[in-house]
């Protein structure tokens, strides 16, 4: 694994209809319908919309035998109209449904957490090694006949592990850990290898981006150790909608794509399925610009653990580094110094002139040659100003520096100036590689100066900035290297959008919270209420509750499991019915949909977590 130079992980090719995946094939884009699978016309129409938007695979839920059998009609309707897109059946709880679906679609997704094991109940189960082996034999006895059906019908499979639906068996032995998620997958993969079944795709997903990235990294390493090269499907489950959904997806998926992991992606947005496709396409196209880049001669620090990174040890300089949360630096060189109270930067880079009226609680950065030592202001130097920096008496100094400027002179200077915060810059096609290389060099030299990452863009659309900046920052955050973020955009976007994006990235990476976090699924044929309007109502009532995590889930597949990561949850329980959760405990069942949002607010209030919105 080269941390500094991009190359795609070598994978085996998997045949999925006329659109193979893995090997030398491009990274495929996909989405999932949210129409009822027994409604042939609606499913075919939505599948066409996904394909017309650029989708290369279409997934449909099949919760029962009738739905699985109707996949034949949906497939036929699409083929009749000239749409040859491979269809994927999404199966939970009932392996018999997978057997049926495998006869009518090009790929079947099964969930190891509920394929043979009973649905998750959060009970701790004790197994002897012999009893555990017997459970694995049960999986083999049920799984092998399914593989034989797939062989007969040239059907591929996806072994799709979800953090929210691990079995009690796995949870009891491994805990709620990346190791448990990986083993849940490997149990099935080893059977595939033993049965010489190779048309297999793997996915391990979570709404928690830290868990998702760490687990996929570990899965790739474990597969490599066991000589497996199956392609990877990437996604952040329950990413949400709007700005949050895009940032969260780009952060998690982008971090893995940037390291060459991933052969197909789905951006799971709580929006129309076809809206996911352009976002996914932009993300893949942006990462693909890393290909064939000039070589970066970085050297990995000896004490860095890619599979289980911890935050880099730094010495705090005022409120930057050490145990402090990552800071946000914003620029205001155009003289427009207004800020959003919810997303007020910690520092504003003003360039060569301070504003006439300063924002309360904000500190300012000025170019060193015009800095005059005013209270609440700090000087910024470039790497060619080392003598000036050395003689400056400020207790906080910013040094803007690209990786290739890290000379012996610079290193020697930094060893005598712990008050310097480094602002890492890069114009390299693979800026992640250079940012990483700079920090790893600091680590090798034993330097503990905090590092803020400067990311430069020229975007006119908020979505483009959100996708690119989140993708660029993802691995840096998950590697534990980030003491701050400085987004500098020279397009037409407002400062408010840029600031909100920076704070959104830190929240999506779970290193700094600035607002309510919503964990919401994209919906599928199992969802029996209007998910998008429900999300809007829940957000309107709770978006001011900074720090709370609220889950809004369409059904019970991942709903209860994902509630373990949420403070409160709203989970579909049947047509027009909702259950409410506090963490993973179901508090009230089968509430009429029209009353559920009000009941959710009552639950939050009853537990002392609600404050009135005074804005």
Protein language model annotation of sequence segments:
Residues 52-57, 105, 154, 197, ...:
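A structural motif
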Residues 2, 55-187, 318, 327-339, ...:
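Active-site beta->alpha loop and helix N-cap motifs at the rims of alpha/beta catalytic domains
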Residues 56-59, 105-121, 258-274, 480-493, ...:
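Glycine-rich phosphate-binding active-site loops on the catalytic face of alpha/beta enzymes
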Residues 282-335, 362-389, 395-399, 504-531, ...:
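Extended, intrinsically disordered, low-complexity segments
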Residues 29, 90, 159, 202, ...:
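Conserved, mostly hydrophobic/aromatic
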Residues 38-49, 93-98, 249-253, 335-341, ...:
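Short, acidic/polar
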Residues 1-31, 147-153, 289-336, 540:
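N-terminal amphipathic alpha-helix/helix-capping segment at the start of soluble metabolic enzymes
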Residues 126-143, 148, 170-320, 396-398, ...:
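Catalytic alpha/beta core domains of metabolic enzymes, predominantly
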